[in-house]
C-alpha cells in the first residue's frame, strides 16, 4: 500500500511501532513520517518489515495460499478460475478467508501484528445461462463510511478481471452484510456525504490483452469519467476484533 502511495493504514501501523519502541526499544523510535519513509525504502523481505509487519493469516494468504491440514497450500482463487473455464455452471465456486484455526487467535503467534478476524469473509461466483459471471460477497462486519466503498470497488473490479480471464461477460456484484455500522466518530462525515448530490458512476476498462489473473498490472486498469466530490477525511475506528 505504501509503495502505491495509499496511506490509509499508516497511522495505525506507526502507533503500534511507537508503542513497541516505548516499551522495549526506545533507541529505534521515530516519527510517523520517518517510519513510513523507512517502510517504503525497505524491501518487503527485509528484517525490519518481515519481523514486524508480516501478516501470516491475512486475506491474500487465505485466498491464494490457504494452508491445508496435510501441509499443502491451496490457491482458492486460482482453482475457481480454472473451474470456471472448464465447467462454468457448477455451484461450488466459493472462496473463503474464514479459517477456524485463526478466528480466536488472529493477533497471537501466527501474526507479527494485530489483525482482527476477517471482515469480508466469503465470496462466490456463479454463471448464468447467457454466460454472465455474477459475484456474491458476504461481509460479516461492515464499516459503512470508510471501508464499504473500498469493498464495493475492489470486488467489482475483481468480477471484471475474473470475467475477462474466463471468457465470460461481467454480470452483477451482490453485496450482503452481517453487521453494518457507522462509528460515532464518523457521524459528521456521513451527514456531509448525505448532503451531497450523487454524481454519475465512472467506467472501468481493462487491457483486453490480459488473459491470466496474475498478469494484471496497475496500468492495465483504466478508470474513465471519474469526477468525485472532494475527499472527506475520517479516522479509522480502533476497535480490534470488531
What is the role of each PLM region?
Residues 1-242:
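Terminal, non-catalytic protein-protein interaction segments that mediate quaternary/complex assembly
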